[in-house]
């Protein structure tokens, strides 16, 4: 047998193996009775295709609309969309025998022994959370109020300059608001983590650290797609990840490490660590890894949420008018708008909640594994080791949970009896349970304060041609597109 014949035999055996494996997955696998497309049941190639195209969340939404509350989306994978499933999977008993642990294959890591909060499991995760939580405590957040106010003022001045004819006469007051949402969130976040901002607002431009974080988030989604096709994931990482994204992790990590080292030399103790590297503190590497992953995740999700809120407000004049009226009637001058006082605006809070519902910041599911012995989820028995998740977009946009699900209606969060049938427990933008978002309060505080000051200082009007944020591509979170608004300065002096 010559070399060509041997190669043909190997290829033939490989193809035969995968045909037999696909046949087993469809007809004999323990999940065979769950509804879903047969091709997806046979192979992970279907999921990989939709992930790489950036439309996985919409694919899952369509599957749930067709097949119902539980769908088999892969050979060993189920997707849910009910409040019951959310409580069981994410909010259950945190004991070692009952925990729905993270699916480490879908989440890139080889094991749960990790140097960061996002991938660590068990006692390691509990330790990280206990040590990091004080940074995001309410008292700490209120103490950061003056810092956030300073960056809000820089944002106001930046928009004031660009909407005024004296600086940019050809723009006719039209500003793409998306970069500015990135600028302010990145400056606040970097100041919180490193003690100084990245000067995005002052320069009116992206810092390389911000762009690198954006690339890293997309790159991680491609890596997840590749890892779904083990043992071929290493070669697929090389083939799938676009060249333009390959330096994301490297650049972001390098800048973060440089900033962290500079901060450690300051006399002021670093707020994110304890005084000494004992068993009850974060090691230098743990500190770096946790800061890096928090910066990547928090920056993109919060800025994406802020731009989406601005879109839905300006696209819905009635909601916009109510939000503007509430802000301008609640305060007699801008100095009264603080991190604390902006929390007393019920309609603005409803606007934020509704934006999180109609376009969840994390639209896909957070992957978990069923524990040993299997578990009942939403009335269905699910075998141990099954990949499970709740598809956030599907849960938040289905008419079976929400009246007028596709419309932006903040009143549904204010006790309007017309929406009494809404299943509000299916909208959990920060997840629930022991692994819920540690920065939830911080993100909400930023959003309320920034929006309050924007609506106090400016009138906004949507320009034609803006894409609905629901139509954006999704790689971990949404890939925002330009959002052009006509901005009218109602407080500043004419230039």
Swiss-Prot record:
Its cofactor is heme. It comes from the Eukaryota. The keyword Thylakoid does not apply. Pathway: Secondary metabolite biosynthesis. GO terms for cellular component: membrane. It is found in: Membrane. Its EC number is 1.14.14.-. Belongs to the cytochrome P450 family. This is Cytochrome P450 monooxygenase FrzC. It comes from Cladobotryum sp. The gene is FrzC.
